[in-house]
Each structure stands twice: as C-alpha cells, then as structure tokens.
C-alpha cells in the first residue's frame, strides 16, 4: 500500500497513524532521496508532533536496516553481544557515559557493537570523544568485525554504515531538534546486536522503544530514562526501565540506593566539548572517585545485565567495579586505539 507524502502529512496533522506498509513506502522515498527536503522535514516534524507510534517506528527502522551496510559477526558471540546507546536529544550535555560504559563492559567480558556518530544535539557525540581518545573510527565493516574479535569492541561510525542517511543529515542538522531519527539510530545497529542497553530522551519512549525492539526480534533489551531527563541510568533521580527478556516486556523503576549508590545531582557531569568529555571519561576509567566513575559503573552494570553476563543490574555493577579497579577497563581504551590504528593505510 502506498501513500503520498502530502497525504501522510495530512494524517499527521489529524493525529492519525500511518500504517506499516505506508511507512515502509515513505521511508524508502526518504532514504532514496526521492522526497523533497521540504516535504521530508515537514513529515519528520509532523510525526514528532503527532508522536510516533510503535508501528511507525518499527517500519522506519526496518527500512533503515534494509539500506544499511552491515557487519557480519560469528553466531557464537551473540549471547553476550550488546549495543550501549542513547537516543541523544536529552539536552543534558553530559560526558559520553555510554561510551565510557562500553570500555568497562568489554573489560568484563561483553562484546560490544557501538553504533554512533558526531554530536547533533549534544556537545560531544561518541565519534567525537573516540577520536579525541585517538581511536580510528573510519573502519570498513570487515575491520569493525576484526576489532570486535580482537578487542571486544567495534565502533561503527553511523555515516559509514548508513550512506542513505546523507539525504536526511542536512534536514536533521538544520532542524536542530530531536526527531524520529534520534529514535531510529539505536534501533538500526549494523552488526545486528541482539541485546541492547538503550537510553531514551522521554519517559513515553521507554515503553515504545522496548516494544519496537520486541517487534524487531531483539533478545534482551533494557531501555532506560532517568527522571531528571537523562537518556542514561541516572544517579540524580529514579530511572524508568522497560525490559524485554524471554519475549516478555515488563516496566519498572530503579533507584541508585537500590545498588548502594548515593543519589547525587548530574550537574557535575556536564562538558563543553569532546576534550572535556575525554578527560572525564578517562578519570572514571582510572578509578578516580566521584560522580563520573559512579555513573559509569551503574550504566556498565546495566549493560552487563543486558549482555546476559550478570543475573541482575546489581551483579553487573559488581563486575563493573572489578573491571575499573583492576585497570582492565582503562586498558581497553589503549587496546582499541592500537587495534583500530593498525587498519590505517
């Protein structure tokens, strides 16, 4: 079933849903560059104002995956293969907590396929801070797979894996607000990681995104929203969790105190640029006491639970503390820098 972009826009204005097959058609037009930027931006904002449904998001993610340049990984690693990602758009401008957590989780035995880009709505995207650390992010899909094998971490720079997104990038940049594409990025991991720790920018998205992951065939998904507005597990407030496990979805709240952590404001986590983010990230991995280390420990613990290496978030936190205290997490940074730079011609 097809629908014209103009009819879809009318549907958005009237707060009516765009059906699965219609959304597939519209997304393919956008990804092929066959929809004018004016109509595409109007439609993207129309969906945002209407509020995207589970069906619309799942259909859009399906098309984005169709157009992606994928990374092949061996089936043997899938049980503990995880993505740690935030939708961005939370406006918090914190250091790269999910990127720091990635090094900790890998040091504790997870295999990570991290999918990210440069800062769009933040001061420092995952690609920005990794480059500041000296990581070569311009890898081929084969090199990403080799990096996962050698280090336990593969970073997939989104523009390399979603070439069709070049048709959307100028629109996203000019709009400068969070849109459907903030929601889609975490759903379209090019390595097909079946497990995920995903932070979202709005509480309504917790239940939506976890059910989208269910439709897309994820194994273990932990979707989180900090009630202080963070797209991470927060130290400054309760965190709303949507979890998909064994095919079932449940929603609940967790608190820092549940894990023996003190509730503290996240104000001290703000950074102005990638260099500041790098300094805070390294401090956390070097076991410097303070809020950065604690929030990384908390999020890495949740990632290790999502990766099926811990029976609970609390058990994951114990593993994360050990990985930081032993120096293994900090060593992962140097390992990733060394391995990725070997690929440079």
From Swiss-Prot:
GO biological process: L-tryptophan biosynthetic process
Catalysed reaction equations from the record: N-(5-phospho-beta-D-ribosyl)anthranilate + diphosphate = 5-phospho-alpha-D-ribose 1-diphosphate + anthranilate
Cofactor requirements of the protein: Mg(2+)
HAMAP family, per database record: TrpD (MF_00211)
Protein name, entry field: Anthranilate phosphoribosyltransferase 1
Species whose genome carries this gene: Ralstonia nicotianae (strain ATCC BAA-1114 / GMI1000)
EC number(s) on file: 2.4.2.18
An MF annotation (GO) of this entry: magnesium ion binding
InterPro entries the record matches: Anthranilate_Pribosyl_Tfrase, Glycosyl_Trfase_fam3, Glycosyl_Trfase_fam3_N_dom, Glycosyl_Trfase_fam3_N_dom_sf, Nuc_phospho_transferase
GO CC terms in record: cytosol
Keywords: Amino-acid biosynthesis, Aromatic amino acid biosynthesis, Glycosyltransferase, Magnesium, Metal-binding, Transferase, Tryptophan biosynthesis
């Amino acid at each position: 079933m097809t629908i014209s972009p103009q009819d879809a826009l009318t549907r958005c204005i009237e707060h009516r849903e765009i059906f699965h097959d219609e959304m597939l058609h519209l997304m393919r037009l956008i990804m092929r560059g066959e929809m004018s930027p004016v109509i595409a931006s109007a439609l993207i904002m129309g969906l945002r104002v209407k509020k995207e449904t589970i069906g619309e998001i799942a259909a859009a993610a399906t098309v984005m995956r169709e157009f992606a340049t994928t990374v092949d990984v061996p089936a043997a690693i899938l049980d503990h293969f995880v993505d740690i990602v935030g939708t961005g758009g939370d406006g918090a401008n914190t250091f790269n907590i999910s990127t720091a957590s990635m090094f900790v989780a890998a040091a504790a035995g997870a295999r990570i396929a991290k999918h990210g880009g440069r800062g769009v709505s933040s001061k420092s995207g995952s690609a920005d801070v990794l480059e500041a650390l000296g990581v070569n992010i311009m890898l081929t899909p084969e090199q990403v797979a080799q990096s996962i094998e050698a280090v336990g971490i593969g970073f997939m720079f989104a523009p390399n894996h979603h070439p069709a997104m070049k048709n959307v990038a100028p629109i996203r940049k000019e709009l400068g607000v969070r849109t459907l594409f903030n929601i889609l990025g975490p759903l379209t991991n090019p390595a097909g990681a079946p497990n995920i720790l995903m932070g979202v920018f709005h509480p309504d998205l917790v239940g939506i995104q976890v059910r989208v992951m269910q439709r897309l065939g994820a194994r273990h998904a932990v979707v989180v929203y900090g009630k202080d507005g963070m797209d991470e597990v927060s130290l400054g407030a309760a965190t709303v969790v949507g979890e998909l496990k064994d095919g079932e979805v449940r929603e609940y709240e967790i608190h820092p105190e549940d894990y023996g952590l003190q509730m503290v404001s996240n104000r001290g986590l703000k950074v102005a640029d990638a260099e500041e983010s790098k300094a805070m990230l390294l401090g956390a991995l070097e076991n410097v006491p303070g809020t950065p280390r604690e929030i990384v420990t908390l999020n890495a613990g949740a990632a290790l639970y999502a990766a099926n290496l811990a029976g609970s978030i609390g058990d994951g936190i114990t593993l994360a503390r050990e990985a930081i205290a032993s120096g293994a997490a900090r060593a992962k940074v140097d390992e990733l820098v060394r391995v990725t730079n070997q690929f440079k011609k």
